[in-house]
């Protein structure tokens, strides 16, 4: 099913992830899901709370951040539809760590950031049996 976002929102995500380089950066995707199609309308950046020496290849947030984001999404009449994060100097392909910490109903936008420049964004969704991710069509529009 397609994942849709506008180009300016994609550029906002790219700028955020370029500023966190060489560490991983990330945030939540807000929007709506209808029959498997996801429309992303807003993002919220989240601080990486993983141990400093591990932030170059790991990303984590606090449970308090998660609860706060659910409240913010509800207040805006939106849903948490997914999560975005970077893979510094690595392909935009989910890692085993990503799979082990992912939720099947979320969309995951992973961006390869190479030498502080975002070069590729791909959309993924974890299978319900949690065995692997499937690539989703990413539609970036005007």
Where do the PLM segments sit?
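Conserved beta-strand-loop surface patch within small alpha/beta domains used
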Residues: 1-80, 88-142
């Amino acid at each position: 099913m397609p994942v849709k976002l506008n180009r300016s929102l994609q550029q906002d995500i790219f700028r955020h992830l370029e500023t966190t380089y060489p560490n991983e950066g990330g945030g939540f995707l807000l929007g709506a899901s209808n029959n498997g199609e996801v429309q992303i309308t807003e993002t919220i950046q989240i601080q990486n709370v993983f141990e400093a020496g591990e932030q170059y290849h790991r990303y984590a947030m606090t449970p308090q951040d998660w609860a706060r984001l659910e409240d913010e999404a509800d207040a805006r009449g939106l849903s948490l539809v997914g999560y975005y994060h970077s893979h510094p100097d690595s392909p935009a392909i989910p890692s085993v760590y990503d799979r082990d910490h992912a939720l099947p109903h979320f969309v995951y936008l992973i961006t390869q950031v190479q030498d502080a420049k975002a070069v590729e964004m791909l959309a993924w969704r974890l299978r319900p049996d949690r065995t692997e991710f499937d690539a989703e069509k990413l539609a970036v529009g005007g």
